[in-house]
Amino acid sequence: MATNRAKSSTKYIFVTGGVASSLGKGLTAASLGQLLSSRGLRVTMQKLDPYLNVDPGTMNPFEHGEVFVTEDGAETDLDLGHYERFLDRNLSAAGNVTTGKVYSNVIAKERRGEFLGKTVQVIPHITDEIKSAVLAMGQPDKNGQAPDVVISEIGGTVGDIESQPFLEAIRQVRHEAGRENIAFIHVSLVPYLAPSGELKTKPTQHSVAELRSIGIVPDAIVLRADREVPQAMKSKIALMCDVDEDGVVSCPDAPSIYDIPKVLHSQHLDNYIIRRLNLPFRDVDWTTWGNLLESVHNPQGEVTIGIVGKYIDLPDAYLSVAEAIRAGGFGANVRANVKWVASDECETEKGAAEALKDVDGVVIPGGFGNRGIEGKIGAITYARKNKLPLLGICLGLQCIVIEAARTAGLTDASSTEFDANASTPVISTMEEQKAAVSGEADLGGTMRLGAYPARLAEGSLVAEMYGATDVSERHRHRYEVNNAYREQITEGSGLQFSGTSPDGTLVEFVEYPKDVHPYFVATQAHPEYKSRPTRSHPLFQGLVDAALKHQAGRS
């Protein structure tokens, strides 16, 4: 069907949350974005985070989850990973705005005298900075194309002190961009009380009342519950919250996060928003997403991939890695299950054998610090000796190099990250990172971040996986392979340095040849950031394919 595209300004959709955190605002926003994209609209997304950190780059993974890195090198909230995966498009640093970043910019302007001696206040200066960040998302890209829709998610919960400047700012955006160009969606919890056997609407009513008290009237309410919310209850919420009945949608827990677009579409949320904003549209094209759901719900087999890490008590610390593994499964039309393995369990040969006995492949993900390192190395040794498919990421590559060096006779091989005075530092601090590591410069935002090119060796396994010898991946690291040991490691262990930076100075990929090990690959980069559920990353696809062969060989 031809797209009914008329000239119109960019529309802005703001997604807020009420009653409780962790309701799935990000997934709701991403799912709506996916639906609008599937209708032929150009959609971009943004996360407004009310914490005072400038970015999540220095935050504890146990507290915040993973740090998602964009192509342009921004360390951002993990929700940007959901946005990129659901929209299948790259976002930029502008997609994540924090209170810390806003205040830093405003204070810098004050120091430069840009406010001409005026008293700097939350209103208008902080709110103006937030508005500028939001409205900038509607500007044309380098190809001259402005987005049709900008979806901005406001972190936290309505009523939080930290969120107040952001809520005031988006209220003002409605005034400046025009009411016809703005839609507010409120995601709220409808709890089920088991003793009475009832869903309760009162928390949602109070949450919307709080939102209305600061001048924001939601156009739509997404009701989160562990079961379907009946129509009578939706009608009651529409009446009490002064929202159109068509704008109150039920979003019960779904079997998979990839089902959420279908759930919202079945409730006509995308239809309602299109009518509300007078957007050009076409019917939803379910071809790509439908094929994904077929793989999700009707797999032709399954494999188990172990993630050997030290932050496994909070799986969100490895969210993109887990999603990339699952996407590799979708690409092979199998279910890829993730087994969380504490690296400490693999420090001994017996411990590694026990922890990894029922997995078909292993991922050694990134991380920082020396805790759990010997366990990661133990898992690597087990995978190497038992021909278990393995993919190493960032720190995972460094651990593989250390393990190979020890195999080659460099028994004291280590990294300067773990031992500043290591006698055999096969992994060393990057020259430009030494000031940050020594404490002479800031830690935040100073790593080697973002997309960098790499050149792969002709005939290597990684070149076969990518189908190319020139590739680009996103990075987040301070340490690198010490080139002084490369030749000795290869001669003593057989490990091949199969990809480097274009000038050959920085190791980007290592592997064992296929005649030595069926799939033993590592990269200094973070390939998980570029994986999509509808388009798996070559390295993760290779891991799952190798895991299937390993599984078949065992049975």
Curated annotation (Swiss-Prot):
<dbReference type="GO" id="GO:0019856">
    <property type="term" value="P:pyrimidine nucleobase biosynthetic process"/>
</dbReference>
<comment type="function">
    <text>Catalyzes the ATP-dependent amination of UTP to CTP with either L-glutamine or ammonia as the source of nitrogen. Regulates intracellular CTP levels through interactions with the four ribonucleotide triphosphates.</text>
</comment>
<dbReference type="InterPro" id="IPR004468">
    <property type="entry name" value="CTP_synthase"/>
</dbReference>
<feature type="active site">
    <location>
        <position position="528"/>
    </location>
</feature>
<dbReference type="GO" id="GO:0005524">
    <property type="term" value="F:ATP binding"/>
</dbReference>
<feature type="binding site">
    <location>
        <position position="79"/>
    </location>
    <ligand>
        <name>ATP</name>
    </ligand>
</feature>
<comment type="subunit">
    <text>Homotetramer.</text>
</comment>
<comment type="pathway">
    <text>Pyrimidine metabolism; CTP biosynthesis via de novo pathway; CTP from UDP: step 2/2.</text>
</comment>
<feature type="binding site">
    <location>
        <position position="21"/>
    </location>
    <ligand>
        <name>CTP</name>
    </ligand>
</feature>
<feature type="binding site">
    <location>
        <begin position="200"/>
        <end position="205"/>
    </location>
    <ligand>
        <name>UTP</name>
    </ligand>
</feature>
<feature type="binding site">
    <location>
        <begin position="200"/>
        <end position="205"/>
    </location>
    <ligand>
        <name>CTP</name>
    </ligand>
</feature>
<dbReference type="InterPro" id="IPR017926">
    <property type="entry name" value="GATASE"/>
</dbReference>
<dbReference type="InterPro" id="IPR033828">
    <property type="entry name" value="GATase1_CTP_Synthase"/>
</dbReference>
<dbReference type="Pfam" id="PF00117">
    <property type="entry name" value="GATase"/>
</dbReference>
<dbReference type="Pfam" id="PF06418">
    <property type="entry name" value="CTP_synth_N"/>
</dbReference>
<keyword id="KW-0479">Metal-binding</keyword>
<keyword id="KW-0460">Magnesium</keyword>
<feature type="binding site">
    <location>
        <position position="417"/>
    </location>
    <ligand>
        <name>L-glutamine</name>
    </ligand>
</feature>
<feature type="active site" description="Nucleophile; for glutamine hydrolysis">
    <location>
        <position position="394"/>
    </location>
</feature>
<dbReference type="GO" id="GO:0005829">
    <property type="term" value="C:cytosol"/>
</dbReference>
<keyword id="KW-0547">Nucleotide-binding</keyword>
<feature type="binding site">
    <location>
        <position position="236"/>
    </location>
    <ligand>
        <name>CTP</name>
    </ligand>
</feature>
<feature type="domain" description="Glutamine amidotransferase type-1">
    <location>
        <begin position="304"/>
        <end position="553"/>
    </location>
</feature>
<keyword id="KW-0315">Glutamine amidotransferase</keyword>
<keyword id="KW-0665">Pyrimidine biosynthesis</keyword>
<feature type="active site">
    <location>
        <position position="526"/>
    </location>
</feature>
<keyword id="KW-0067">ATP-binding</keyword>
<feature type="binding site">
    <location>
        <position position="79"/>
    </location>
    <ligand>
        <name>Mg(2+)</name>
    </ligand>
</feature>
<dbReference type="GO" id="GO:0046872">
    <property type="term" value="F:metal ion binding"/>
</dbReference>
<dbReference type="InterPro" id="IPR029062">
    <property type="entry name" value="Class_I_gatase-like"/>
</dbReference>
<dbReference type="GO" id="GO:0044210">
    <property type="term" value="P:'de novo' CTP biosynthetic process"/>
</dbReference>
<comment type="similarity">
    <text>Belongs to the CTP synthase family.</text>
</comment>
<feature type="binding site">
    <location>
        <position position="478"/>
    </location>
    <ligand>
        <name>L-glutamine</name>
    </ligand>
</feature>
<keyword id="KW-0436">Ligase</keyword>
<dbReference type="GO" id="GO:0004359">
    <property type="term" value="F:glutaminase activity"/>
</dbReference>
<dbReference type="InterPro" id="IPR027417">
    <property type="entry name" value="P-loop_NTPase"/>
</dbReference>
<feature type="binding site">
    <location>
        <begin position="22"/>
        <end position="27"/>
    </location>
    <ligand>
        <name>ATP</name>
    </ligand>
</feature>
<feature type="binding site">
    <location>
        <position position="153"/>
    </location>
    <ligand>
        <name>Mg(2+)</name>
    </ligand>
</feature>
<feature type="region of interest" description="Amidoligase domain">
    <location>
        <begin position="1"/>
        <end position="279"/>
    </location>
</feature>
<dbReference type="GO" id="GO:0003883">
    <property type="term" value="F:CTP synthase activity"/>
</dbReference>
<dbReference type="GO" id="GO:0042802">
    <property type="term" value="F:identical protein binding"/>
</dbReference>
<feature type="binding site">
    <location>
        <position position="21"/>
    </location>
    <ligand>
        <name>UTP</name>
    </ligand>
</feature>
